[in-house]
């Protein structure tokens, strides 16, 4: 079993926003991947962006530039 690590988890209001996040991150080479929302978090959309904690500032800047609004930003074991 893979050991859980503390990660940055960004949730979204819609699946469209989660998919947009995936597209812009892939295009820009940003850290992270789409995951199902962890059971410890409640969100409107069932998908979340998971990345290393150190990537938080860069990802938030990218989201502002691309007008993607997060529902929540968490640091949790994933």
Regions found by a protein language model. Give the residues of each.
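Short amphipathic alpha-helix segments
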Residues: 13-31
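A short linear hydrophobic-aromatic micro-motif
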Residues: 31-37, 71-72
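Small/polar loops that bind or transfer phosphate-bearing groups
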Residues: 10-13, 51
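Short, charge-patterned binding micro-sites
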Residues: 39-47
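Short glycine-/aliphatic-rich beta-strand segments at the starts of folded cytosolic domains
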Residues: 2-11
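Short, flexible, solvent-exposed loop/turn segments with mixed acidic/basic and small polar residues
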Residues: 1-2, 34-40
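C-terminal structural segments of small proteins and small subunits
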Residues: 50-78
């Amino acid at each position: 079993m893979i050991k859980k690590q503390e990660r940055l988890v960004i949730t979204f209001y819609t699946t469209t926003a989660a998919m947009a996040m995936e597209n812009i991150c892939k295009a820009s080479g940003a850290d992270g991947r789409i995951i199902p929302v962890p059971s410890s978090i409640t969100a409107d959309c069932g998908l979340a962006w998971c990345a290393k904690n150190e990537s938080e500032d860069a990802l938030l800047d990218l989201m502002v530039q691309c007008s993607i609004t997060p529902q929540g930003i968490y640091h949790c074991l994933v």
